[in-house]
């Protein structure tokens, strides 16, 4: 079972990577977008992994038999929860007047960051 230390490490790392990626993309609203995007990504990854831990979801951690992309359902769930939390935080809180395409794009970057961090870094 995944430990709280691993969950915390993965959430923080996902948030840092997502925040950095959004900072690169959001030129005019760099700090205003990047920090909340990183926090939302970390919160999403933390929430998903806490749910798996509480539900004893050991089978979600089985990696696909692909050398290039050994993803599991746990990795995918982190990306999905990061997408949802980032879309809500950015769309409803930080960038309410921004075009939906931009908000969803930033949220997708957060989801991809969380997914890739889960697959390759822990």
Residue ranges and their predicted role:
Residues 1-39, 45-122:
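Juxtamembrane/disordered regions of integral membrane proteins
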């Amino acid at each position: 079972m995944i430990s709280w230390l691993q969950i915390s490490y993965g959430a923080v790392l996902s948030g840092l990577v997502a925040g950095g990626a959004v900072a690169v993309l959001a030129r005019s609203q760099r700090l205003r977008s990047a920090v909340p995007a990183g926090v939302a990504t970390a919160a999403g990854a933390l929430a998903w992994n806490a749910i798996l831990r509480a539900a004893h979801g050991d089978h979600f951690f089985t990696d696909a038999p692909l050398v290039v992309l050994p993803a599991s359902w746990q990795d995918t769930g982190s990306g999905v929860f990061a997408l949802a939390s980032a879309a809500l935080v950015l769309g409803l809180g930080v960038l309410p007047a921004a075009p939906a395409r931009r908000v969803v794009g930033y949220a997708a970057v957060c989801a991809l960051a969380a997914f890739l961090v889960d697959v390759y870094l822990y």
